[in-house]
Amino acid sequence: HGGKGTLAAAIPGTKSDEIISILTAAMGKSVRRKVKEVTCDLSPSMMLIASEVFYNAHVVNDRFHVQQVYNEAVDEIRIDIRRRLIAEENNRDKSVPPKTYSNGETMRQILARSKHTLMMSQNKWSEIQRHRVYILFKYHPILKSAYTLAMELRRIFNAQISPTKAMSRMSKWYEKVMALGNNNFRSVIKTFKNHAPTILNYFRRRATNASAEAFNSKVKIFRSQMRGVRDRDFFIFRLVKLYA
C-alpha cells in the first residue's frame, strides 16, 4: 500500500551489523539521505543502526522510554522500603498486630497498593488513592521527593519549548535527582549521561515512538488471535499484506 504509517521493513534479530547491511542494501544513499529523524528506544544497537544507516537524520530517544527508566527507579525505592518492612515484621513478636493507619490499611498494604498510583498524575487519583499516598509520603518522604521529580520530568516533556530551553530545565532536574543520593537512581543518572543529546532531540519536533509501539501491540493481538505462530514466514507475509 505504501504511505504514511505503514510498515517499511520487518527484519529478524537485533544484531546491528546484520540489520545495517540489510537496510543499506535495500536503500541507496540518495533515499537514506532524505530521512531527517529516527525515533527509537534506549537500545544501543538500535541507536547505532539509526545513526549508521540514516546518517543525515537526528536520532531521538522516545520520551516514554526515558520516563519509564525513571519510573522504574521510583518503584525500586517502594519495593526496597516494603522489603525492609517485611523483614522487620518477620522479626517482630507475632502476637502484636501490625499498625493500621487512618485509611484502615497497614503500611505493608499501603506500599503494595501504591505501585500504579505513583505512576499517575495527582489529578487522576481517586480519594482512596489520595488518602493512601498522603500517609505514604508522610512516613516515607523519599518517595514524595522521587514522585515530585517524576511529575517534573513529565512537565518538561509536555512543555512546548526549544531544545536549548529543555537542556536548561533538564540540567536543573538532573541536579535534583543527584541530590537525592539514592542508589536506585544510578540507572537514571547513567541514562541521562549517555543519551542527553538524543533525549533532547525530542524537543525539535516532539516525535515519539508511539506508532511503532502501537504496531507492536497490533502484532501481539494478531498473534494471539492466530493462537501463536507455526509458520513464521507466512506470518510475516500476512503482516506485510495487512500493514505494509
Predicted region positions:
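Acidic/histidine-rich catalytic cores and adjacent linkers
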Residues: K4, A25-N56, V60, F64-Q67, ...
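Structural motif
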Residues: S16-T24
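Short conserved beta-strand segments at catalytic cores or DNA/RNA-binding microdomains
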Residues: H1-P12, T24
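Short alpha-helix plus adjacent loop in nuclease-associated cores
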Residues: V66-A87
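Short, flexible loop segments at the rims of nucleotide/cofactor-binding pockets, characterized by
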Residues: G13-D17, E37
